[in-house]
Amino acid sequence: MKVLSCLLATLLALVPGLLRAQAPATAQTAYPFRNPQLPAEQRIDNILSLLTLEEKVSCLGTNPSIPRLGIVGTGHSEGLHGLALGGPAHWNRRHEVPTTQFPQGYGLGETWDPDLLRQVGRVEGYEARYALQNPKYATGSLVIRAPNADLGRDPRWGRTEECYGEDPFLTGTLAVGLIKGLQGDDPTYWQTAALMKHFLANSNEVGRERTSSNFDERLFHEYYAVPFRMGVTLGGSRAYMASYNAWNGTPMMVNPVLRDVTVDKWGQNGIICTDGGALKLLVREHHYYPDSAWAAAQAVKMGINQFLDDYKIPITNALKAKLLTELDIDRVIRGDFRVMLKLGLLDPPGANKYAAIKDGPEPWLTDQHKAVARLVTQKSIVLLKNEGSFLPLDKSKLKTIAVIGPRADQVLLDWYSGTPPYVVSALAGIKAKVGDSVKITYEETNQDNRAVNAAQAADVAIVVVGNHPTCNAGWANCPDASEGKEAVDRKSLTLSDEALIKQVRRANPRTIVVLVSSFPYAITWTQQNVPAIVHLAQNSQELGNALADVLFGDYNPGGRLTQTWVRALSDLPPMLDYDIRNGRTYQYFRGEPLYPFGFGLSYTTFRYSNFRLGGPKFNKAGELLVSVDVQNTGDRTGDEVVQLYISHQHSVVVRPQQELKGFQRVTLKAQEKRTVQLTLRAADLRYWDEGRQQFILEKDDLNVLVGPSSREVKFQQVVRL
């Protein structure tokens, strides 16, 4: 979605009702909708009774304000990995504000830590309140467009960087963590409102304005919709964005599932918005309606209540043509006001504790927020290879380190990033870690053989490579075929800088590769020939510090992969094949991956023992407790991610070869042993019966598996469903 699309959505035309004299403040507070003691729906009834039709139409934008009544709308801000009030896209361009920036969503996913994502959400939500309510800034919004609950079914997808991976349970669990952090823990009010995107199956960029993602209802309910359902029912989100694409031929912004599933079945009764310019695309690209009036009318009838588009004329024409009624508009804009009530925007300021977030130092400059950014980045780092315990480095045994590569002295920001208050590059982090005791040489490229010469003269070479999140090019343009972003899918999985890695490795066998990337690469040669490889995502302001902490052993990496890293493009089905049963993701992939889903190494070792189930069958609550003892058998503290998978043995329908249904990241001191308990829920084992239009829990033999990755099973046991 382009910046201009977002700006257009908030430029609402003046209507006659706004020309009336402003009501005095005392009169405003007398309105029943200002009384927090009244039921929410009664307060909304009062608002609707006071609005003119023109004012109601104005509430179909992203900032449903009614100045005549003193109602100030919510607005929208981006926030996938930190509040975006600046950055490469110049969000909030009239008053850009620095904010704490975390790793991209891909890196947040690799933490496998929903509690940590809750901390990320708290930081982001607090900074949103502060920026809006502090008189010095007085800017921003309280509806935050995050998380991205799309699934990374294909590593070629240009926006893989935004997602938490290919698995619905993992993505949903992490999304719930971020949502709860953004919205806060107050029983009455929200800190901010989390708006998930993009519903649904929106994982190709090329042609997304017109393509249809085709798959059956089972995959809708069992795969693609799972993170969104969890975000609503478990996380409490009451806002999401409909995607550009169609599902089985029906564009998502007018698809009946918006109303019939998310509203009627899940209880999503807040904001449902379009993507930028999507209203025009219904006519121009999808050719689904004869004109924009028809398109706007059907969108409202399906539940859309906020347009990121120039919508007012189409809505007005739809009303004139009787394609839409005032009651239709009343029905949907109730959701806008429900969200405003939860944000406390219609209540006295003293009633809402979040309204007091406006004093004190800028939060993005505090040690607390900096520490969260560093911890998240540390936890996101995945150790892919460590031959002969090459890492961690002992700086007392080193005299010279060569830091090489185009990403070594950069912290690159993506389109949805804000502006961090500072950044620490890999080079800067390494220099700060070793101080004056070790000589650091730096070469960006191998021009004039400089990188090779530096590597030959060093005790160890660290090569830092990866993608450019904006492709260092204009919109919809990526000169490097292996790179992608919004509007551009990747055409290759080959890392162009692997040639540099080869040159350095031949010059110095003691080479470490740091892959800073927004998605997987087919780095087969590197895996076979380089002794140590780590992966981390782009964008974190603490990238260099966290990386240095890992390389020199001050932090033991425990991140895990969230996608299957394939060896070649030939391992993948066609890009637009949305039926994952055709060999997609760890659930159905039939080949030998370069790195499997859930994989990640540590500087220590772990032993699993005493695997047991809570009983021979599920209890009356439909739950089964799965326990295993995990011991750190090494000499340093480390994190293990215990993963619970299931596979159906005799299902009457086609099922995945395995499915993640539980996980827990635990920190264990050297030699410490702990019992890890995971709860398997029968509700998560059902399949969607298309004939009966409901979930079914079938009688079956269920294999319960526990281990550190999808390809490494330590224990398994069959239980009867």
What is each residue range found by the language model?
Residues 712-721:
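Short beta-strand elements
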Residues 17, 22-688, 694-711:
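Glycoside hydrolase catalytic-domain context in secreted enzymes
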Residues 5-17:
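Bacterial N-terminal signal peptides
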